[in-house]
Amino acid sequence: TYLAAFDALNFSPEHLLYIVHEGSILKRSLSTFQTVFGGDVFMGEYTGEHKDLDASFLFSTNVSMCRSLELFDKKQFDYIIIDECHHAAADSYKKIIDYFEPEFLLGLTATPERMDNQDVYELFGNNVPYELRLRDALVNELIVPFKYYGIRDDRVDFSKENERKMISQFVTEDHCEFVVEHIEKHRVPNQKLKALAFCKTVSHAKMMAEALEPFYKTAYLTGKNDTGERVR
């Protein structure tokens, strides 16, 4: 975000549009731009709650902007930033990109290669002004190094066609003990454990949180949780 803010500062746009997919990211991004630009630029939000149409720098979610394109001139923004632009293959983003005619369009992402083979680079003319790969970031100590463990799990039959039946195998007493065993084996000794587990479905997340509750303080988050619940 700071990289985009400093590039925008160098470009010196009269009107800037910043698109994100989530409200909490929007507020952090706006705060970053306020830090870089100071109080000389009127910045505002265009979301379900705020409609700061007079702002020179407008920060909006893709959903809100996609629903309100007719309120804006095609050339209204001379600089547009698409944050988390690996999402830009979605229809709402494509409508925004196709509608506006900025002098400069910038996309930011840490994961440009999508699993569905949709080409994010093509949306930006295959022009990559700056790229920093994970290995280079690690070598330059820009991010915390990590250790990756591949653990063989023979307790689950992944060939089952019924997804719910397959997921139910994850929460058996035997499998939970297996998970806890490896968590304890690889965790840092004598330090508070903070862990994030990615699950296949909402029901899977709920079931795993409940199954591991006897061993750890657990909670599960889904798209239905609001920002306050996520932060807490």
Model-derived segments and their meaning:
Residues 86-148:
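Post-DEXD/H (motif II) to motif III coupling segment of the RecA-like Helicase ATP-binding lobe
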Residues 80, 84-86, 205:
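Conserved Walker B
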Residues 27, 42-53, 206-207, 216-232:
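Conserved helicase ATPase core of P-loop NTP-dependent helicases/translocases
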Residues 48-79, 90-95:
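Conserved helix/coil segment N-terminal to the catalytic DExD/H
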Residues 13-16, 23-49, 215:
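Conserved helix-turn-beta segment of the N-terminal RecA-like "Helicase ATP-binding" lobe
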Residues 3-11, 29, 96:
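Hydrophobic residues on the short alpha-helix immediately C-terminal to a glycine-rich phosphate/catalytic loop
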Residues 128-196:
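Conserved interdomain linker/interface between the two RecA-like ATPase lobes of SF2 helicase motors
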Residues 1-7, 194-198, 221:
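Walker A/P-loop
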